[in-house]
Amino acid sequence: LLEHEEGVRRLITRPMGLRLAPHPGCHMLRPSEVLRLDRSFRPEVLDKIASWAGATVDPGPEWPACCGGGLAGIDEVLSAKLLMDSVRGPQASKVDAILTPCPFCFVQFDIKQKEGVPVLYLAELMALAMGASPERIGLRYHRTKIALPSP
C-alpha cells in the first residue's frame, strides 16, 4: 500500500475528517528487524495512511501498548489489563475511534473493552474514504458505534 500512495490518494472521494488513535498491533511491527515496515518506537505507517483518507491522528504513546488479544485464551485477567492500558490514552484524548489493521486488536477493542471507544479497521477507513457506505462495509455490526461526519 505504501508504494502506491499517489494512486490511493486519487481514489479518495470522501475525506473522513475523523480524529483517530492509531494502534498498529504487535504483529505489524515486530520483529522490526525482519518486517522492516516501520520502526517499533513511535511507528508512523498508520498515521501516514490515515492522513491519505483525510483523518487526523492523535500522536499517542511512543511505544504502542499490546491490546492483549493474543493472550485472551490463555490469561483473561492479563488480557483485560493490557486492553485497559491500551484504551486509556485514546479515551482520555477523546478521539473518534481507534484505528487498527489487526484482527486481534479489533476484537479486543470492539467486543471486550468496556470504555466505549469505537474502533475502525484500516480497510474500513479506506473504503469509507473511497466512497463506500457504512452499510456496505458493515459498520452496523460494530458493538461500539462510531459517529461519522456527514458526507
Give the location of each predicted region.
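Iron-sulfur cluster-binding electron-transfer modules in prokaryotic oxidoreductases
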Residues: 1-151
